[in-house]
C-alpha cells in the first residue's frame, strides 16, 4: 500500500471513530463530546477527498465546497440558538446543490435504469413530507421548500451514479426526513430520532463521498508514477 493510500485509509478510520464517539455521546447525553465530534465530520471527509484526487477537477471542487457548507451546517447552527435551524437548512441546501452538480455528469455517464426507476418515488416522499411539515415550518417555509427540491434532486441523481452514491443519497434523504419530523412534526418523531438522524446522516454522507471518489477516473495511488513507461512484450 502506498503512503498516500495509507493516509487515506487512516482518515476513513478516524472518521468512523469520530462518528462512533458522537453516537456514543448522544446515547450518554454527553453534550461536550457531542459538540467536539460533530464539527470533525466534514474536515475529515475533505481530507479524504484531497488525499484521493490526483489533480483538481470540477467534481472535486464541488465535493469540497459541499463539505464546507455541510461543516457550516454542523458547526455554526449549534452556535446560533435563535437562528440555528435556518442556518442549518441554508447550509445544507447549498451543500446539496454542490453535490447535485457533482453527481450530474456521473449520472449522465453511468446511469442505471433500475436504480433510477427505484429512485423516482423519492420525489413523492419529499413532496408528502413537505406538505405534512408546511404548517410547522412557519417563516422558514420558503427555505424548507427549496431544501426539499434540492434533496429530491440530489437523491435522484445519486441513484444514477453507483451503488455507494445511491445508498448514500438514500440515507441522506432518510436522515433529512427524520430531522424534518423532529423539527416540524414533533408528534410524529420516532424513539431515539436524534441518534438515528446522525447515524443515517454520517453513513450516508460518507457513502456519497466515497461513491464519487470511486467514480473518479484515477486516484492518487492508481495514477501512473512520473516517468512510468508502457512495456509491450511480444511472444
PLM feature segments, named:
Residues 1-235:
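Polytopic alpha-helical membrane-helix bundles and their juxtamembrane interface segments
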Amino acid at each position: 500500500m502506498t503512503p498516500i493510500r495509507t493516509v487515506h485509509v487512516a482518515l476513513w478510520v478516524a472518521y468512523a471513530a469520530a462518528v462512533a464517539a458522537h453516537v456514543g455521546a448522544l446515547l450518554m447525553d454527553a453534550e461536550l463530546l457531542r459538540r467536539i465530534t460533530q464539527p470533525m465530520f466534514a474536515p475529515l471527509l475533505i481530507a479524504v477527498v484531497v488525499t484521493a484526487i490526483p489533480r483538481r477537477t470540477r467534481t472535486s471542487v464541488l465535493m469540497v465546497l459541499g463539505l464546507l457548507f455541510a461543516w457550516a451546517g454542523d458547526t455554526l447552527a449549534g452556535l446560533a440558538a435563535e437562528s440555528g435551524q435556518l442556518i442549518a437548512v441554508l447550509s445544507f441546501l447549498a451543500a446539496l446543490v454542490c453535490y447535485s452538480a457533482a453527481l450530474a455528469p456521473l449520472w449522465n455517464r453511468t446511469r442505471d435504469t433500475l436504480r433510477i426507476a427505484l429512485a423516482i418515488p423519492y420525489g413523492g416522499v419529499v413532496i408528502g413530507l413537505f406538505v405534512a411539515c408546511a404548517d410547522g415550518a412557519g417563516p422558514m417555509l420558503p427555505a424548507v421548500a427549496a431544501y426539499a427540491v434540492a434533496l429530491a434532486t440530489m437523491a435522484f441523481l445519486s441513484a444514477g451514479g453507483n451503488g455507494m452514491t445511491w445508498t448514500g443519497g438514500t440515507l441522506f434523504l432518510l436522515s433529512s426526513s427524520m430531522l424534518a419530523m423532529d423539527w416540524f412534526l414533533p408528534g410524529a418523531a420516532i424513539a431515539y430520532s436524534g441518534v438515528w438522524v446522525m447515524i443515517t446522516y454520517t453513513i450516508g454522507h460518507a457513502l456519497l463521498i466515497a461513491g464519487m471518489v470511486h467514480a473518479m477516473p484515477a486516484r492518487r495511488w492508481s495514477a501512473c508514477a512520473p516517468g512510468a513507461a508502457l512495456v509491450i512484450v511480444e511472444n
